[in-house]
């Protein structure tokens, strides 16, 4: 999964005991929009429902706010809405804890059920404030993504219905009996809806049972975390539902011992889920959305723990940062969002939301089409052309286009704060390519090397992202340069987006990768990155030069080109991992050079061989595509050198030259011509020779792994597995 909106955070401060080990922590770049949503729902609740402490002890924290860390890849334009929804849920939950009879469960649940079924919630003058808030929130979400907004309302209604059971007194016989009830009571269904809406995910209905099964450890870990930290807040409630209380009663122990039991269970469930994420991402029998959902949900686990350690909701007296204090005292009208949305697409059909959720009018803000002045429920005028990001939008015609009124055009020309165009267009070709199936071989190589190098998770993640961007960019450019119609059995990127957009997207990834390299902890990492990038371009230049001029290189020249081109990425990731390793002063990257060279050479020669001999490869890339491209593969070089050295094959040499010239003129070869070339290769036994070289290199790779295991004093099973996967 590509991470567009978040960065890795060192979680050692928040989890010194390592309870969430194996699960990273990420922070959303647009976290300020969460605060705006939270303070907006607080203002609406006080106006429409009743008194509320200020600031409210909900999702916000002085350093870590809930959604910013638990949904780090939420589409930015949806972040304020799900923040509003979450704190609405917290406020309603607090009412249930204090007095379930006065919490209006049937009214709220009925409103949400109607919203889930019809896409709207009926309201009138006599409607409760909670119903009005739910109705307005649903309208905002429907404007962004109708299908997922209705799914959210439906799942939230199920959670509210379950909360009604809290009035029942329960005599739990065991923790395992308590857990299923509490997991549902936790607000899991509401949270499921928020995440799928926020990240624009739809898990297929036929995978629902599998989704619940895979997610179970994460839900349990979050439930136990919630109960652990909320115990002090809830222990004096009328009807507390808390694991600490249950454990104390069942085990007949004190608070501290019960809390340790909670921590132990959290550690176990986190370890389970970390393994589930890893296994799920490697599966090929489930949808991409289910994979994405399971991967995203791991941040609910780590983010929930980090938030719980410092949030005012669980810690008294609560701490707030300065901006939160100002917004609590003066309102979000005076202190609006500081984050400027780059894009306003709804994630479904690329439709732009107009003002959407960011109106500053409180609960009755409008979409502001045509820039008309509207009145809210209290009769106060508001200008719908001002959104939550604090800038005026240009006047719009009824068709939603820029006004051509002279004053408006001049105002636009003088406006230095126009919204950014965003990177959505430049990323489209890249996102298409990365959505195609991939074996993730380079990620496997990084993880295998880390068995020895112990690189911190932040640097490891950055290197993986960097290598992915470079590899994807090179594939996009290679397909253009080689005129390849297929990539992984799908149309190549340039076939869909055109050469110009694909080149622009690919080069943008190079700039992104450079930025990532500059952010690595070792200052030498950027120099390593630039050195290897230069080698990649030089290697590619020879490949293109030989193809364009129909010049057959020697085996020596071919291998050197492979070292710089294909082997370059393996060498780069190896050198970067060594540079970022805590023991880099004791490890010379030269010690790993033979391995990276061998992998690069084996990988390329294997690719050459499969292009000519594998039916699956033909399905993925086209029949004997290297001959269409005019590439001088290892097998073709051997064939040419063999016929040139054998006078008995003079006629085959003439035919081979004729085919290569024809390919250059026509831009490809017919299947009949390709079959003739394969026939010549059969006579020279070039495929057999290539297979023999591959098997010899395989043995050398295995010996090199053994040598390195001796050097590092540790067996490396992931590396051996990776090498074994390459066998032909």
UniProtKB/Swiss-Prot annotation:
On whether Transmembrane helix is a keyword of this UniProt record, the answer is: no
Residues noted as binding Mg(2+) 2 in the record, renumbered to the chain: 93, 97
Supply the InterPro entries for this chain.
Answer: Isoprenoid_synthase_dom_sf, Polyprenyl_synt, Polyprenyl_synt_CS
Q: Motif DDXXD 1, which positions? A: 93-97
The segments labelled Geranylfarnesyl diphosphate synthase in the record are: 323-728
Residues recorded as binding Mg(2+) 1, renumbered to this chain, are 93, 97
Query: Which residues are recorded as binding substrate?
Result: 93, 182-185, 226, 230-234, 313-314
**Which EC number applies?**
4.2.3.145, 2.5.1.29, 2.5.1.81
Cite a single GO BP annotation.
Answer: mycotoxin biosynthetic process
> Motif NSE/DTE: where?
226-234
* Gene3D superfamilies linked: Farnesyl Diphosphate Synthase (1.10.600.10)
> Per UniProt, where does Mg(2+) 4 bind?
478, 482
Q: What keywords tag this UniProt record?
A: Isoprene biosynthesis, Lyase, Magnesium, Metal-binding, Multifunctional enzyme, Transferase
Residue ranges annotated as compositionally biased, kind Low complexity, are: 362-371
Q: What does this protein do?
A: Bifunctional sesterterpene synthase; part of the gene cluster that mediates the biosynthesis of the sesterterpenes ophiobolins, fungal phytotoxins with potential anti-cancer activities. The first step of the pathway is performed by the sesterterpene synthase oblA that possesses both prenyl transferase and terpene cyclase activity, converting isopentenyl diphosphate and dimethylallyl diphosphate into geranylfarnesyl diphosphate (GFPP) and further converting GFPP into ophiobolin F, respectively. Other sesterterpenoids (C(25) terpenoids) are found as minor products of oblA.
Q: Which family does it belong to?
A: In the N-terminal section; belongs to the terpene synthase family.
Protein name stated in the entry: Ophiobolin F synthase oblA
Gene name, per UniProt, is oblA
